[in-house]
Amino acid sequence: DLLRGTAGFDKFREAVSVHFIEVSPALREMQAKTLRCVDVEKTAVKSGFTAPKNVFDDEYRDARGDVSTPFVGEAHTRAKSEINGADVFWHDGLESVPPGPTLVICHEFFDALPVRQFQRTDRGWCEKLITIDSGLSEEGKQREGAEKVVGRDLEMVLSPGPTPASHVLVSRRLKALPKEQADSLRLLELSPPSLALWDRLADHIEKHSGAVLAIDYGEEGPLGNTLEALKDHKFVHILDTPGEADLSAYVDFGGLRQIIEEKPGTGVKCYGPVTQQQLLLSLG
């Protein structure tokens, strides 16, 4: 739609190129078909999503940008779209996107990134964790915040006390809120990979100019417990059939905006969030 909608602007059409950040060979192929790509070039690709390094807490080693993953075959890396003649490229991460003015579209992207959940207790902000069945009595489970799924060996529990993640992430989010609101919160859900990626996108725009549009399920925030699982078009418990359901969580747009507002000396501005209706009406 974006290519068709801008096809009538000759100078824009001649200047634009399309860059997908996509690690799935199957989805790359679908994207190539959607854009009616020809002259396709392929190369070997790795499996798995490599999230940007979490800039807030070095504890998250799974967010490092240099994680080694196995090769799984060939996937699209370059082609040309017959819709408007634009060159199309695929990348494993933002770091390989070339410099230059950039328009970034994040459509239902951030809601698929991992989240961490925290709960205020008399021990402080504890983190919700997933573990094997602890064997606690029902009274003990209730006291420790455990949540068991019948027929499964996994359960959600609370950490014994504050974790490094709660020390860094929770305090950072709460300081942007009015004191009364911050003191009243009992649950908090945050997405470290989303915050880290938004920070990197802001740096890219600051350096090369452009804009980023995020379209997603979400709210101003802060959010509590929005993580949900969908399997066969039905909602299921997130611990039921792990690995077989699609997981998503609402986007904390206020948390993303906070990243921009706290960047020292940045020329990047952040607007919104607004509803999809408001956006479309403003465009006429």
Task: Locate the predicted segments by residue.
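SAM cofactor-binding core of SAM-dependent methyltransferases
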Residues: 1-94
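Class I S-adenosyl-L-methionine
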Residues: 59, 87-284
